[in-house]
Amino acid sequence: MPVPGWGSYPPFDRDETSAITYQSKLRGSVTVYDPYSALEVPSNDSEETKAFILEQNKFSRAYLDANPDRQTWLETLKKSWHYRRFTTPTRESDDHFYFLYNDGLLAQSPVYRVKVDDVDSILTESGPGGELFFDPNLLSLDGVATLTGTAMSPCGKYWAYAISEHGNDWMTIYVRKTSSPHHPSQERGKDPGRMDDVIQHCRIFFVSWTDDSKGFFYSKWPPDENQGNGNAPGVDCKIYYHRIAVFLSEDPEHPGWFWNVEVSPSGQYALLLGTRDASLNQLVKLADLHTSDIETGIQWTTLHDSWQARFSIIGNDNSLIYFRTNLEAENHRVAAFNVHHPQAGFTTLVPGSLDSVLLDAKLYGINKLVLVYQHLAKHEIYLHDIETGRRLRQIFTDLAGKMTISGRRADHEMFVLYSDFISPGTLYRQLLNRYKFDKDTDKGLLFRTIKVDALNLDDFVTESEFYPSKDGTLVHMFITHPKDVFTDGTAPVLMYGYGGFGAPMFPNFSISNLLFCNIYRGIGGSEFGESWHREGMLEKKQNVFDDFRAAAEWLVTNKYARKGGVAIRGGSNGGIMTTACSNQAPELYGCVITIAGLQDMLRYTKFTFGDLLRSEYGNPENPEDFDYIYKYSPYHNIPLKEVTMPPMLFLQSDYDDRVSPLHTYKHVAALQHRFPKGPNPIILRIDLDSGHYAGKSTMRLIEETADEYSFIGKSLGLTMHLPNNSNYSNRWCVLG
């Protein structure tokens, strides 16, 4: 067979002797060969891995840059991303509202603030308003410093914040006085005004201040020589109190457990939460900070130690503490715990729903409880009486998308930011009577709207469909497309899915996805997370792949997509799905995009936080689990028969310490070896000096998206349709 027109893949030496023996319940001892195990060694410790990255990038860049549509995509995305966007304003204890604002192409979004009395002046057509408080773009020369978490002290004088570099999970916590904001004219690469407090080796932002503002609880990990290279293990998490570095929690028998502390909004109670796996079920302990001495040691009382549920503290009224929990309520409930009567346990205040998941709960005023539910894939907000739990009414009944709320109990208002697949964001201001329920004064007002000039969003529509999976189960899917694209079986479709950890796919606005719909005259849809999480985990993981495959088949059968015109896209856990599906039905998909996925499911527990994921995927060293994991593990199930694999683009960051890059490296090497002269390309694009999704600058995201969409267009044989005007309207559709 001649060499394909796009050239030969970079060579890499296989080790045919590398193997591990596993125990199978069905087959006894099973020897599994791993010829690319050398790629498990990070690039900063291995010349082989370093050379592999270099050669793969040379190869992929040559292919991607040869596509004339790539540059057109790049320029189109730059123009289209140039629209202002912001987050929900949050009132803090220094009597300011804080919010993120980006005018379009800034690498990272700066933090702005405004005095409470001047909140009406912010987010106008002329700009953010208020004053610049903190700009992460000033911390580095190339926009790689990311603000990953913040926590204001109760007194309003101190602001704790975490900075990560290159999108890495590892972060450093700093503290600055709120009286020391950034200035736009300051020198880049520095952070003047911060205090001497520096806390390194943090991996997840768990910061909770005590009510005296003298310090805060935080979680950290010990230094590790693999920190930042994608292979550092997530073990030995410990809880500290910053002011005097008092060591609060250690469990040498369980080094893989995570610990964090939540302080109640009143500041009286601290909740110590232990997490041991990806189920996020917790060990829960409580302490009264008003009667404890942090210096001499906190006395913790165990509230729950059976690892059967998750808890988050909502607030408290004296000794009565309110929790959001899924204890004895699969979809979560609001429960109350009386510290003075612990024998009563967690009593139900608002029972769990049968068809809606309680996502968030906040207290307002004297007796108001605001609850945010997920119903199907949209959010619903209800107002309850905290004393009786009685539902008073639903607010924002005409909205059917994603809603984020902010506010404090002391406030008489909250902000609600709404978005969906075709709405970039509408900010509402909900007024709440502090003392009673009043239908005349408790009302929502339109505050601000995010506008996109590059597209006429009224030209798009989102449909909601149910389709049967392999076993007959009805699965939900969203489909977004231009109104003038019809179901005649000629359109391309881009499918996105995640399918794991009980994470639902909420309607999420993406200008890039709408541009795909608008330019390629296509159709887009979204796999609806896992409403039935247990039916898609462990030994039932195959159900997720069956659901995704059934969606593609349904779209073709019902003429939403043309045969061979379905492109699939997934990242992280979704990367298991795209690679497993392309192994199992390569003929069904016209193109496959995989972003930072897991592929070697027999080795995933050995790297980064992999050991915590056993509750989701199973333990390959357990004979029963081995049998079902080995059956679908993408790296071990590349087709042996003569098949034509679809065009495949793998996107990976070299310093990803959430999902180790070794998965992608090994899988791509194996695919290229198995199909060296196939008619379709198997391409690996490695983003250097970056981590798992978060922290990428706006321009890096635009460049990556241009590579993705031009690759899809070429793979599906699509022609770009750009009108002569600047609105790019009515041309493509994407699956969101």
UniProtKB/Swiss-Prot annotation:
EC number per UniProt: 3.4.21.26
Record keywords, A-Z: Hydrolase, Protease, Serine protease, Virulence
A GO CC term assigned to this protein in UniProt: cytosol
Reactions catalysed: Hydrolysis of Pro-|-Xaa >> Ala-|-Xaa in oligopeptides
Pfam families referenced in this protein's UniProt entry, alphabetically: Peptidase_S9 (PF00326), Peptidase_S9_N (PF02897)
UniProt GO BP: proteolysis
Molecular function GO terms recorded: oligopeptidase activity; serine-type endopeptidase activity
SUPFAM superfamilies cross-referenced by the UniProt entry: alpha/beta-Hydrolases, Peptidase/esterase 'gauge' domain
Described purpose of this protein according to its UniProt entry: Prolyl oligopeptidase; part of the gene cluster that mediates the biosynthesis of dendrothelin A, a highly methylated cyclic dodecapeptide showing slight nematodicidal activity. Excises and catalyzes the macrocyclization of the methylated core peptide of dbiMA to yield dendrothelin A. DbiP works in a two-step fashion with an initial cleavage at the N-terminus, followed by a second cleavage at the C-terminus of the core peptide.
Summary of subunit composition and partner proteins: Monomer.
Name this polypeptide is given: Prolyl oligopeptidase dbiP
Organism of derivation: Dendrothele bispora (strain CBS 962.96)
